[in-house]
From Swiss-Prot:
It comes from the Eukaryota. NDH is composed of at least 16 different subunits, 5 of which are encoded in the nucleus. Keywords: Chloroplast, Membrane, NAD, NADP, Plastid, Plastoquinone, Quinone, Thylakoid, Translocase, Transmembrane, Transmembrane helix, Transport. InterPro entries: NADH-Q_OxRdtase_suN/2 (IPR010096), ND/Mrp_TM (IPR001750), Ndh2_N (IPR045693). One of its GO terms (cellular component) is chloroplast thylakoid membrane. This is NAD(P)H-quinone oxidoreductase subunit 2, chloroplastic. HAMAP family: NDH1_NuoN_1. It is found in: Plastid, Chloroplast thylakoid membrane.
Amino acid sequence: MKLELDMFFLYGSTILPECILIFSLLIILIIDLTFPKKDTIWLYFISLTSLLISIIILLFQYKTDPIISFLGSFQTDSFNRIFQSFIVFCSILCIPLSIEYIKCAKMAIPEFLIFILTATVGGMFLCGANDLVTIFVSLECLSLCSYLLCGYTKRDIRSNEAAIKYLLIGGTSSSILAYGFSWLYGLSGGETNIQKITNGLLNAETYNSSGTFIAFICILVGLAFKLSLVPFHQWTPDIYEGSPTPVVAFLSVTSKIAGLALATRILNILFSFSPNEWKIFLEILAILSMILGNLVAITQTSMKRMLAYSSISQIGYILIGLITGDLKGYTSMTIYVFFYIFMNLGTFACIILYSLRTGTDNIRDYAGLYIKDPLLSFSLTLCLLSLGGLPPLTGFFGKLYLFWCGWQSGFYLLVFIALITSVISLYYYLKIIKLILTKKNNEINPYIQAYIITSPTFFSKNPIEFVMIFCVLGSTFLGIIINPIFSFFQDSLSLSVFFIK
């Protein structure tokens, strides 16, 4: 009996952060059904409190030894704890970004928070999924909530179109991924646990068969769709442009973090017997993403479409760390993902704030913004320059470590293209900054002329401005303490299943 209780508490502790979020979304659902006239402040309070408790628990658990629980379907180690913390952290920042937007768009608040929390839970389970069934169910939990969030502004035709496109593309990619899983299930003798599948393929000597190659291609294509890698990226700009901007901010980071954690686990465990092969394919996808993402971003007139192509190029940079395959490469990848959260969400906070005050996201309508709102102009400038990797901002140090690890591992062409495309990205970022900062009074557009600042002080009560300032500070000053951050993540990742011998 004592052994059973110990196992219960051990297994329960591995999914305690997820259980807290599930409990909170059930409370929100009950409140929504029970009280017709409810105070929305309490709903936000419950959501944010549960997320804060979850991330505190994750931070206490990040250095625990790897634990396989629930009959091998879930694995807890330092790698997935870090990525789960990133997902929860993104949700904490994205909920304040949505408060004013939801109020202006007259959207239902309880359902929105339920979808955000459910997507967060799905992403967290996906980071530690150790079984094909668990992977697929977690992925669909995240995906289905993403589709619903994209179409949440039901009165907006563009939002409905984005939701339908995302549903069709997402369903197709999930089907391709499931087809690849079915090949592995058959070739391994009916196993669903990813370690047992690898052992089954090695024991049956089918790891070099055409069936395994088909499974690998299908899984890689499915993952490439989820990560918006070229040439499987076509859906991304349309979804970014049509969906509510806070939803885009949420999906632009959480879906990539969860997808990256899944790709790392699958490629390092399922296909550990052929690392050179999958690295070649990933290198090609990363190069295409960096080149096409940055070149097409130059031609965009919408801020959200520009950020869509920018995110495509950013995931290309992040893949450099995964391709290197060693501890330093994974550490640099993790650091850049952490920095990317601040840079990307800071940029989206600026866009949300500007679109709420003007109703536009066209790049040319930002002309002369510095005259009316210096704080917003300064914040957007710093976030864009950090995304471009301009020293001495945070993005520069993230890219520096990433490129250096790739160069040390011998991926010279990959790093060279990354450097060239980073310079190209500075062009379209600086083009926007020039537009914001250099227009004269007689050239100001009508949107800026009618622009009204609701809270011009630095210490703002506006939650969007609070998140914006927080992310700007992270995008600007985190690079100063890059060495302690690198040591922290390196020590943590050294305890993950990928590096424990």
